[in-house]
């Protein structure tokens, strides 16, 4: 199984500043220009919400202050500027193979 190592586990950022979350896969999840890495936001009592698919593609309706980058094994989620409503847990997830696995999460 592919292991996703997320860092940091928790992150405190002042409103208006930048939050950066990293995700490292135990093997490459990229091929032919596609990276099979996705980012989710989860608030207490709610299901995960897809923010970014295929490393850098913003899901419809998600604010442009969320952005993703990376390829191969190393990926990053950036939030800038951070707003109060961004208080949540963030998870990376790959879809390279079955089983799909998630990172352990980052609490913002």
UniProtKB/Swiss-Prot annotation:
Q: Name one GO biological process term.
A: adaptive immune response
Q: Where is this region: Framework-3?
A: 61-92
Q: Which InterPro entries match?
A: Ig-like_dom, Ig-like_dom_sf, Ig-like_fold, Ig_sub, Ig_V-set, IgV_Light_Chain
Ranges for region Complementarity-determining-3: 93-101
Q: Does the keyword Disulfide bond apply?
A: yes
Official protein name in the record: Ig kappa chain V-III region PC 2154
* Pfam families per record: V-set (PF07686)
């Amino acid at each position: 199984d592919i292991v996703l190592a997320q860092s940091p586990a928790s992150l405190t950022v002042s409103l208006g500043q930048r939050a950066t979350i990293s995700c490292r896969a135990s093997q490459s999840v990229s091929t032919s220009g596609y990276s099979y890495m996705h980012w989710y936001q989860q608030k207490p009592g709610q299901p995960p919400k897809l923010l970014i698919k295929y490393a850098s593609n913003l899901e419809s309706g998600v604010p442009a202050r969320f952005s993703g980058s990376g390829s191969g094994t190393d990926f990053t989620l950036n939030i800038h500027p951070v707003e109060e409503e961004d208080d949540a847990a963030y998870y990376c997830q790959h879809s390279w193979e079955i089983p799909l696995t998630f990172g352990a999460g980052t609490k913002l």
